[in-house]
C-alpha cells in the first residue's frame, strides 16, 4: 500500500500543564490552532504544507499528535476556531492559499522562470507546461472535416443528458476511421478527460484529479482484448472511484452522471461487462 501523502492535515495534540510551543518549519505554508478542553487539554489545529508530504513526515513535524488528512480545508479551519470548547487562541502561522490561488501562484512561477522551475521541481514544471499547452490547443483547434455518419451519431448521443448506466462503445475494426482523432478533438473541450488506457491504478489516479469529467478511452490497436480495464470503465460510470495510488481514497459522486465513451478496434467482452450497458456505434 503506497504511503499516504497530502497537503492539508488536521491534528490533535493532547497535553497537560503549560501549552506546548510549536515551531513550524519552512515546509509549512499555513497553520491555525487553538487550546481546547473537552475532558482534557489539547491543541486542535489545521496545517497546509507547501507540497504533498507523507504521514511519517507530519509525525516528525508534530511528535505525539494525532494526524489525519483534511478533506475539506475550509471546514477544518472553521473547526479550529469553534468557541464552545476554546480556552485560548486561535493562533495562526503563515498565509493560507486557496486551491485556485495556489494554481495561479504556480503558473506565475512558471511564467517568470520556467527553466528554474524545471531544475528545482521537474514534475511541477511538466504539469504547468501541460496546462499551458492545453490552453493554447483549445484556443486554436477546430474540426475542419466533414463529419462521418458515426461521428454525427456520436455527437447527437452525447448532446443528450448522460444516464447512470450507458457506456458508449465506438467500434471500428479496420483502422483509419477517425476514432483517435475524434476522441482527441472531443477531449479538448472543457469538462472532458482523455486516456489511452493503461494500468487501472494509473487511470483511476489520473481521473481522480478531476473526477467530474466526461471520459474518452481511446484503446490503441496494439492492446490485447484481455487487458481492457472494464473495472475502471464501470467505476467511472457508476460514480464510485477507488484511487489507491499516492493518496488512497474513495470518491463518491452519486447523481452526477457522465458520458463514458470507449473507442476500440474490437467489440466489448460481454462476459466481463453487462451487455445491456453497452451502446454500440459502428464506424
Curated annotation (Swiss-Prot):
Active-site residues per Swiss-Prot or TrEMBL entry: 79 (for dna cleavage activity)
Short sequence motif RCR-1: positions: 10-13
Record keywords: ATP-binding, Covalent protein-DNA linkage, DNA replication, DNA-binding, Endonuclease, Helicase, Host nucleus, Hydrolase, Metal-binding, Multifunctional enzyme, Nuclease, Nucleotide-binding, Nucleotidyltransferase, Transferase
InterPro entries per the UniProt record, alphabetical: CRESS_DNA_REP, Helicase_SF3_ssDNA/RNA_vir
Protein name per UniProt: Para-Rep C7
Its biological purpose: Initiates and terminates the replication only of its own subviral DNA molecule. The closed circular ssDNA genome is first converted to a superhelical dsDNA. Rep binds a specific hairpin at the genome origin of replication. Introduces an endonucleolytic nick within the intergenic region of the genome, thereby initiating the rolling circle replication (RCR). Following cleavage, binds covalently to the 5'-phosphate of DNA as a tyrosyl ester. The cleavage gives rise to a free 3'-OH that serves as a primer for the cellular DNA polymerase.
EC number(s) per entry: 2.7.7.-, 3.1.21.-, 3.6.1.-
Amino acid at each position: 500500500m503506497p504511503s499516504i501523502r497530502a497537503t492539508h492535515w488536521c491534528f490533535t495534540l493532547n497535553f497537560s500543564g503549560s501549552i506546548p510551543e510549536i515551531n513550524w518549519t519552512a515546509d509549512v505554508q499555513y497553520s491555525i490552532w487553538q487550546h481546547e478542553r473537552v475532558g482534557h487539554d489539547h491543541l486542535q489545529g489545521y496545517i497546509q504544507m507547501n507540497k504533498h508530504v507523507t504521514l511519517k513526515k507530519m509525525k516528525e513535524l508534530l511528535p505525539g499528535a494525532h494526524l489525519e488528512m483534511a478533506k475539506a480545508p475550509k471546514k477544518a479551519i472553521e473547526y479550529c476556531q469553534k468557541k464552545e470548547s476554546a480556552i485560548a487562541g486561535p493562533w495562526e502561522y503563515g498565509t493560507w492559499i486557496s486551491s485556485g490561488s495556489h494554481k495561479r501562484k504556480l503558473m506565475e512561477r512558471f511564467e517568470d522562470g520556467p527553466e528554474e522551475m524545471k531544475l528545482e521541481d521537474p514534475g511541477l514544471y511538466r504539469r504547468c507546461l501541460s496546462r499551458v499547452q492545453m490552453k493554447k490547443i483549445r484556443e486554436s483547434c477546430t474540426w475542419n472535416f466533414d463529419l462521418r455518419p458515426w461521428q454525427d451519431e456520436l455527437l447527437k448521443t452525447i448532446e443528450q443528458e448522460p444516464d447512470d448506466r450507458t457506456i458508449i462503445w465506438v467500434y471500428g475494426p479496420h483502422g483509419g476511421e477517425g476514432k483517435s482523432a475524434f476522441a482527441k478533438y472531443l477531449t479538448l473541450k472543457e469538462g472532458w478527460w482523455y486516456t489511452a488506457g493503461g494500468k487501472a491504478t494509473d487511470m483511476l489516479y489520473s481521473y481522480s484529479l478531476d473526477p467530474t469529467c466526461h471520459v474518452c478511452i481511446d484503446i490503441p490497436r496494439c492492446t490485447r482484448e484481455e487487458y481492457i480495464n472494464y473495472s475502471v470503465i464501470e467505476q467511472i460510470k457508476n460514480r464510485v472511484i477507488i484511487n489507491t495510488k499516492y493518496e488512497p481514497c474513495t470518491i463518491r459522486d452519486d447523481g452526477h452522471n457522465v458520458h463514458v465513451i470507449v473507442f476500440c478496434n474490437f467489440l466489448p467482452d460481454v462476459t466481463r461487462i453487462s451487455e445491456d450497458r453497452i451502446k454500440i456505434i459502428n464506424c
